C-alpha cells in the first residue's frame, strides 16, 4: 500500500461513492491537472486499487500540425502551447515512473478512447478532475453516462480551482457575481485554507493488463509533424510540474517581493526577467495546484507584518482567476457577444487586413508590434502588455471585434484559458465588467514610461535596433537622414502607422458612446436590426466628418 506525504494539519475528505463494478483497478484520466502533488483524482484512484491505469488522450484536432494556420501549430493551438503541453506530459510520465507507474498515451477522439478503455479493462473506478470548460462539460456527460451504465464508479473532484463555481452561484441566488468585490464577499475563504494536501507518494499501484489497446509514449514535436526549425525563437518557459514547483519556490523565496506585489506597478517591458511570477501557464495546465499556491501565499502573509491585499496582491491575481471561472460557468454564451446577457452589444468593424496587421506585429506602432511579436515567438507577454494590444485592437484605435482578438490569443498564448481569455477580452474592450471606455492606453506614451530607451522594442523588433531613443516609439517622426543612418526607412523597412492614434481613438470613443447609449435605451435587449441601424449611422457620421476635414483649408 502506498504512503502519502502531507503538508498541512487537517484532512481532505474524498466522499467516495459505493461501486457496483467487480474490477479491482482504477482508471485516472488526465486532461488538465498534469501533476502528482495535490491531485485528489489521483489520490482516490490509487486508494484500495490493485492496479491503476493513468491515461492521457492526444486529440489530433488539437495536437497535429495544420499547414493552413496563420502560425506554426495545429488548427486549435500554436506550437508553443503544444510544446509546453508535451513537456508537461513528459514530466508527469517521469514522475509516475519513479512511483512504479507510467502515463498511457492514446491518440483519437477522447470520448471514444475512454469508452474503449472501459470496455477493455476491468476497473471499478473512473477518476478525473472536474472541468468547467464547455468542451469538457459536454464530453464528460457522455463518458460519465457510459461508465455509470456499466457499474463503474465515477469520481470527478473540483481541484483545478479554489472554489466550486456551482457552489458560488448557488450561494449568490443562482447567478454568478458580476463584480470582483461581490465575488469575494460571496466566496469567503476556500475550504483548502485549512485542508491537508497530499503532496507526494512513496509508490502507486502498478498498471494492470493493457490488453489489445494501442498505447504509445509521449510523442515528440517531430512525431506530431513539426520541424525542429519551424520556430527559431521558442518560448523560454518550460512545461511540467517539476518546473512549476521550482518556479514557485523561487518566486516565494523573496517574502518581501510577495508581500509588496502590486499588479498595476509591474513593468510590461521586462522580458529577460519578467516582473511577475509567470505561473499562469502552469496553473492553466494544472502543473501547479492553485490550492497549494494559495496555502504558500497565506503562509507568507502570516510571517510578514504588512502585505498588499486583493485585488492588487498576488493572492488577488489568483482570486481574479476564480472570479472569471465562476462568471464563465454561470453565463450562457460567455465566449460570444451575441446571446451573452452580460456583454454590451457593439457594432464592431470587420477589417481582415487590419486584424492581420495587428496579429502579425505590423501596425506601425513599435510598442504594439513588439508585444505581438513577443506573443508570436514566446506565447506569453506581461498582463499590462496584453491590455495595451487588446485596447488598441478594439475600443482604442481599430474598433475591431473582441472575439477576433480573443481567437488570436486563444491560439498563441501558452496560458490560454477559456474563461480568463474571454473574460479579459470583454473587460478590455469595455464590453463587460469595466465600462470607462474613455480611458485608453496610448500606443506611444504607455510603453515609454517603463522603457524610455526602447530595449524591449529593440529586442523583439530588430529592424529598429539602431533607431535613436527619441524616435524609437514614433519612428515615422524621424528625419529621413536619421532613418537612413538607422537602416530603417519607414514605409519600406518598417510600416507606417496604420491609423493616427489621436483621431482614431477619438472616433472610437464616439462610437462607444453611441453603442452604450443604444444599450441603455434598449435596456440591454439590442437585436441585430438595432446594431445594423447604428452601424449605418456611425458610417454616415464618419463619412460626413471626413468630408468636413477635407474641406478645411490646408496651412501652407
From Swiss-Prot:
SUPFAM superfamilies, per database record: Cryptochrome/photolyase FAD-binding domain, Cryptochrome/photolyase, N-terminal domain
**Pfam families per the UniProt record, alphabetical:** DNA_photolyase (PF00875), FAD_binding_7 (PF03441)
Record function comment = Involved in repair of UV radiation-induced DNA damage. Catalyzes the photoreactivation of pyrimidine [6-4] pyrimidone photoproduct (6-4 products). Binds specifically to DNA containing 6-4 products and repairs these lesions in a visible light-dependent manner. Not required for repair of cyclobutane pyrimidine dimer (CPD).
Give the protein's recorded name. (6-4)DNA photolyase
* Molecular functions per Gene Ontology: DNA (6-4) photolyase activity; DNA binding; nucleotide binding
Reaction catalysed?
(6-4) photoproduct (in DNA) = 2 pyrimidine residues (in DNA)
Recall the taxonomic lineage recorded for the source organism.
Answer: Eukaryota, Viridiplantae, Streptophyta, Embryophyta, Tracheophyta
S-adenosyl-L-methionine as UniProt keyword: no
Task: Give the co-factor note.
Answer: Binds 1 FAD per subunit.
Question: For the site Electron transfer via tryptophanyl radical, which positions are given?
Answer: 348, 402, 425
Binding site residues for FAD: 263, 276-280, 317-321, 380-383, 386, 415-417, 421
Per the record, the gene is UVR3
**What does this protein need as cofactor?**
FAD
Q: Which organism is it from?
A: Arabidopsis thaliana (Mouse-ear cress)
Q: List the expressing tissues.
A: Expressed in siliques, flowers and leaves. Not detected in roots.
> Which UniProt keywords are listed?
DNA damage, DNA repair, DNA-binding, FAD, Flavoprotein, Lyase, Nucleotide-binding
This enzyme's EC code(s): 4.1.99.13
Amino acid at each position: 500500500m502506498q504512503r502519502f506525504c502531507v503538508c498541512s494539519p487537517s484532512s481532505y475528505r474524498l466522499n467516495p461513492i459505493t461501486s457496483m463494478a467487480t474490477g479491482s483497478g482504477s482508471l485516472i484520466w488526465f486532461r488538465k491537472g498534469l501533476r502528482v502533488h495535490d491531485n485528489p483524482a489521483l489520490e482516490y484512484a490509487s486508494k484500495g486499487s490493485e492496479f491503476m491505469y493513468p491515461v492521457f488522450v492526444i486529440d489530433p484536432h488539437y495536437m497535429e500540425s495544420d499547414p493552413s494556420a496563420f502560425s506554426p501549430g495545429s488548427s486549435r493551438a500554436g506550437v508553443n502551447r503544444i510544446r509546453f503541453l508535451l513537456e508537461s506530459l513528459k514530466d508527469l510520465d517521469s514522475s509516475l515512473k519513479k512511483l512504479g507507474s507510467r502515463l498511457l498515451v492514446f491518440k483519437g477522439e477522447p470520448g471514444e478512447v475512454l469508452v474503449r478503455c472501459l470496455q477493455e479493462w476491468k476497473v471499478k473506478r473512473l477518476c478525473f478532475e472536474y472541468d468547467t470548460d464547455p468542451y469538457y462539460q459536454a464530453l464528460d456527460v457522455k463518458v460519465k453516462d457510459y461508465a455509470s451504465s456499466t457499474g463503474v464508479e465515477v469520481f470527478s473532484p473540483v481541484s483545478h480551482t479554489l472554489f466550486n463555481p456551482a457552489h458560488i452561484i448557488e450561494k449568490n441566488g443562482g447567478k454568478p457575481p458580476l463584480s470582483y468585490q461581490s465575488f469575494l464577499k460571496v466566496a469567503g475563504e476556500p475550504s483548502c485554507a485549512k485542508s491537508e494536501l497530499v503532496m507526494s507518494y512513496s509508490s502507486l499501484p502498478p498498471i494492470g493488463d493493457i490488453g489489445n489497446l494501442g498505447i504509445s509514449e509521449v510523442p515528440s514535436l517531430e512525431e506530431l509533424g513539426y520541424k525542429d526549425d519551424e520556430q527559431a525563437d521558442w518560448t523560454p518557459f518550460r512545461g511540467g510540474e517539476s518546473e512549476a514547483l521550482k518556479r514557485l519556490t523561487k518566486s516565494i523565496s523573496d517574502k518581501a517581493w510577495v508581500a509588496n506585489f502590486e499588479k498595476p506597478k509591474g513593468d510590461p517591458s521586462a522580458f529577460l526577467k519578467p516582473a511577475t511570477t509567470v505561473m499562469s501557464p502552469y496553473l492553466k495546465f494544472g502543473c501547479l495546484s492553485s490550492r497549494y499556491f494559495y496555502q504558500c501565499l497565506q503562509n507568507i502573509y502570516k510571517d510578514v507584518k504588512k502585505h498588499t491585499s486583493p485585488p492588487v496582491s498576488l493572492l488577488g491575481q489568483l482570486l481574479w482567476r476564480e472570479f472569471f471561472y465562476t462568471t464563465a460557468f454561470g453565463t450562457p454564451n460567455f465566449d460570444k457577444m451575441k446571446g451573452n446577457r452580460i456583454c454590451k452589444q457593439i457594432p464592431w468593424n470587420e477589417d481582415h487586413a487590419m486584424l492581420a496587421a495587428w496579429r502579425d506585429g505590423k501596425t506601425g506602432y513599435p510598442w504594439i508590434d513588439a508585444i505581438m511579436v513577443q506573443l508570436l515567438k514566446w506565447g506569453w507577454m506581461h498582463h499590462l502588455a496584453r491590455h495595451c494590444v487588446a485596447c488598441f485592437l478594439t475600443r482604442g484605435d481599430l474598433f475591431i471585434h473582441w472575439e477576433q482578438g480573443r481567437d488570436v490569443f486563444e491560439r498563441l498564448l501558452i496560458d490560454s484559458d477559456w474563461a480568463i481569455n474571454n473574460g479579459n477580452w470583454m473587460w478590455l474592450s469595455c464590453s463587460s465588467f469595466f465600462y470607462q471606455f474613455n480611458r485608453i492606453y496610448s500606443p506611444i506614451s504607455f510603453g515609454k514610461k517603463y522603457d524610455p530607451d526602447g530595449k524591449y522594442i529593440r529586442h523583439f523588433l530588430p529592424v529598429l535596433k539602431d533607431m535613436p531613443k527619441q524616435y524609437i516609439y514614433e519612428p515615422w517622426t524621424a528625419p529621413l537622414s536619421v532613418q537612413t543612418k538607422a537602416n530603417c526607412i519607414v514605409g519600406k523597412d518598417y510600416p507606417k502607422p496604420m491609423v493616427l492614434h489621436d483621431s482614431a481613438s477619438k472616433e472610437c470613443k464616439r462610437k462607444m458612446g453611441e453603442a452604450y447609449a443604444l444599450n441603455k435605451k434598449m435596456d440591454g435587449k439590442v437585436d441585430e436590426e438595432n446594431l445594423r441601424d447604428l452601424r449605418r449611422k456611425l458610417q454616415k457620421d464618419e463619412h460626413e466628418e471626413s468630408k468636413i476635414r477635407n474641406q478645411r483649408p490646408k496651412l501652407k
